[in-house]
Regions:
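Positively charged n-region of N-terminal signal peptides that target proteins for export
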Residues: 1-5
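Bacterial N-terminal signal peptides
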Residues: 8-19
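A short, N-terminal "cap"/entry segment at the start of jelly-roll beta-barrel domains
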Residues: 20-88
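His/acidic/aromatic-lined binding-pocket segments of jelly-roll/cupin-type domains
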Residues: 89, 95-99, 123-124, 132
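Short, conserved beta-strand element in jelly-roll/cupin
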Residues: 92-113
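An anionic, turn-rich surface loop/hairpin at beta-sheet edges
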Residues: 111-131
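Conserved metal-binding segment of the jelly-roll/cupin
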Residues: 125-146
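A short hydrophobic beta-strand segment most commonly corresponding to one strand
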Residues: 146-159
Length: 159
C-alpha cells in the first residue's frame, strides 16, 4: 500500500514536472541507451505492466543495461538490468529512485568514492518490491548479482 502510494506520488510529480522540463539527455550508458518516449506535456502516458515486462525481456535478449522509457530533460524514467556489477558513481545534481522488480543484488551507498570504489558505505541486499532513494552527492553502486531489473527515476539534473 505504501509502495503503491509512493509510486503514485512519484508518477504524479513526473507529470507535473513535464510541463516545465527542458529537452535533454545524459545519464549512465548514454552512448548505448535506447529512448522510447519523449515526455508529453499535454497528456498522460501510460506504461502498463505488460509493457514493462516486455521491455525487460527485450533488454535481456539484447544485453542492454539501460533503456530510457521517458525522457523529460530534468527527469527521466529508465529500465535498468544489471548482471554482475557496475562501477560505483556519484551524481552532483541528480536525485534517484530505484524500484526493484526482479532479482537481487548488493547495493552500497554513502561513504566516499575513491578510485572507482566506495569506502565506508552501507551495504545491503535489495530484492523485488524494495524502493531506494539516493540523493545528490551520495556514492552508490550495485554488485554481486546474477541479474537485477529495476525502474530508475532521475530528477533534478543531467550529470
Amino acid at each position: 500500500m505504501i509502495r503503491t502510494r509512493l509510486f503514485g506520488a512519484v508518477a504524479l510529480t513526473l507529470c507535473a514536472v513535464a510541463a516545465f522540463a527542458q529537452a535533454g539527455g545524459g545519464g549512465r550508458g548514454a552512448a548505448a541507451r535506447v529512448t522510447r518516449h519523449q515526455a508529453p506535456a499535454d497528456k498522460a502516458l501510460d506504461l502498463p505492466d505488460a509493457t514493462l515486462k516486455a521491455e525487460f525481456a527485450e533488454m535481456a535478449a539484447q544485453k542492454l543495461i539501460t533503456t530510457r522509457l521517458i525522457e523529460g530533460g530534468a527527469y527521466s524514467l529508465n529500465t535498468r538490468r544489471i548482471v554482475g556489477s557496475e562501477p560505483a558513481q556519484v551524481h552532483k545534481s541528480i536525485i534517484e529512485f530505484y524500484f526493484v522488480r526482479e532479482g537481487t543484488a548488493t547495493l552500497i551507498t554513502g561513504g566516499t568514492l575513491a578510485e572507482g570504489k566506495i569506502r565506508g558505505g552501507v551495504e545491503r541486499v535489495v530484492k523485488p518490491g524494495d524502493v531506494v532513494f539516493i540523493p545528490p552527492g551520495i556514492p552508490h553502486g550495485i554488485s554481486n548479482t546474477a541479474g537485477i531489473s529495476y525502474l530508475n527515476i532521475h530528477f533534478g539534473g543531467t550529470d
